[in-house]
Amino acid sequence: MIYFHDIDPIALSLGPIKVHWYGIMYLLGFTAAWLLGRKRIAAGRLPGVDANGFSDLLFYAMLGVVLGGRIGYMLFYALGDFLHNPLLLFKVWDGGMSFHGGLLGVLGACWWWSRKHKLHFFDTMDFMAPLVPLGLGFGRIGNFIGAELWGKYTDGTWGVVFPSGLPAPLNQLDHATLQAQFATGALNQFARHPSQLYEAFLEGLVMFVVLWAVSAKPRHRYLVGGLFALMYGLFRFAVEFVRMPDNGVYVAFDWLTRGQILSLPLIAFGLVLLVMSRRAPVLQPQLPVTAGGKA
């Protein structure tokens, strides 16, 4: 049954302060990552690091997501606007975050943190990889609630009519008028793939279940990080076929998107890590030692 999107993106208004669902989804993602990360620390999945050390790591990773995501968006998707007005970088309230930029930010933060704590960088990445899909899944749900990053038109019964995705002059009509037209079936031809939910399922739920299961037992170094890069790259590349291209423009061949191009290096990187993992040492959990000297 085709659905008419009428969810208010603002969850709560306190005078001039508006709390958006997208921000709440980010908070839920980070909270879930913090709780499950502490559980993994207690199980000895990152030897030499306690709960406080992990909290520091997650804090720097959060900074990496925000800074890298914003800078990446401006460089990958809005370079012309950024060069014309560099101050746009700081207008985060206008939206615009890039996963690939956020990933680079997280990698940079984890590299710095690992070097500071004298840990192998990829041990840190293998530890963090199962936690990232939590943020991805909640973030994509936030995209759906905010009616952004919608997909292409579909005649499937699971399609969604996004008022902001309607062509002119329909997108100028008030909400009540659009709902009345939707009730007659007049807007069914404008139903779109809920690509945000596809990504929430694949990049969020599926990746979390797989990576959590693999990382829950002794495994070779590079394996979990390699699976993360490969799976995300493949899932993102596939979903891009039913997702509207960023800025409505294809990069090449009238089908290749910028998101797909940015995913290709991830796929290659993931394959390289998986090959490297075959000769890498097997990582065994080491339970933290208590004050009494017993694990």
Swiss-Prot record:
Which pathway does this polypeptide act in? Protein modification; lipoprotein biosynthesis (diacylglyceryl transfer)
Which cysteine-cysteine pairs are annotated as disulfide bonds in the entry? none
EC number(s): the record gives: 2.5.1.145
Compartmental location = Cell inner membrane
Q: How does it sit in the membrane?
A: Multi-pass membrane protein
Q: Example GO molecular function term?
A: phosphatidylglycerol-prolipoprotein diacylglyceryl transferase activity
Q: Which GO terms describe its cellular component?
A: plasma membrane
Q: Which UniProt keywords apply?
A: Cell inner membrane, Cell membrane, Membrane, Transferase, Transmembrane, Transmembrane helix
Binding, a 1,2-diacyl-sn-glycero-3-phospho-(1'-sn-glycerol): 140
Q: Does the keyword Transferase apply?
A: yes
Q: Where are the transmembrane segments?
A: 17-37, 57-77, 92-112, 127-147, 196-216, 222-242, 255-275
Name one matching Pfam family: LGT
| Top EC class of this enzyme | transferase
Kindly list the biological process annotations in GO that this record carries.
Answer: lipoprotein biosynthetic process
Per the entry, what this protein does is:
Catalyzes the transfer of the diacylglyceryl group from phosphatidylglycerol to the sulfhydryl group of the N-terminal cysteine of a prolipoprotein, the first step in the formation of mature lipoproteins.
Q: What is this protein called?
A: Phosphatidylglycerol--prolipoprotein diacylglyceryl transferase
Gene name of this polypeptide = lgt
